[in-house]
Amino acid sequence: MRLALGLSYDGRAYQGWQSQATGLTVQDKLEAALAAFANSPISTLCAGRTDAGVHGLMQVVHFDTDTVRDLSSWVRGTNRYLPSNIAVQWAKEVTSEFHSRGSALSRRYAYILLESPVRPSIDAGRVGWVFRPLEEQAMRQAADHLMGEHDFTSFRASACQALSPVKTIKRISIAKRGAYWRFDFEANAFLHHMIRNIMGCLIAVGQGAQSPDWMREVLMARNRKVAAPTFSPDGLYFLGPRYDANWGLPERSPAYDWLPL
């Protein structure tokens, strides 16, 4: 049978999602826990790979197994073997046609940014940080240039393995509460470091170092060297994929309510 799981994790302690020889990735920890619970090896596929230091509020994975357990047992049993900064939120049986990556209609991320003259303390590692004020309207105007289908080569890491740099951004929203900014992104898919590179450019515009129209110049250049430096992973959260409602999978986890705004 095929199962889908939703899980959340604090990415600070891990070298990203994808399995590595070190074993210090979220995928490695999850597969070890699943194998311990099911008493057999299990290989997972995820909806979206996250980089080192990036957090997940609702990563979705699927796997095939002959082990029969109640769905609630898959949640509680797997969590028993997981470290405290990773937790399975739900489990659901799906048909063999479901694919955590291939069935996703879009993917959603949020970036939480602290604007303060003093560096983060209690939220260190969970938020990005700027000490110069940001101008919201300028950032909104800059973000508008990125909406729709474009070649995002200028925002692509050199190590990116995507077959095409052409992606479609469906939504970018910017909001602020107190000292905290929240940037939401939704696209059909994202390139390696794409959001962190966009964040670097938005901050350059927000602080007045560049004009809003500079974002279009960066986009059209199709050259990573013309964009701002890659911003910190600390405040980046994978909110999860969107699927067709017919799959019956949750779109939220309780961790959503923890994020500001």
What are these regions (language model features)?
Residues 1-261:
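Structured-RNA-binding interfaces characteristic of tRNA pseudouridine synthases
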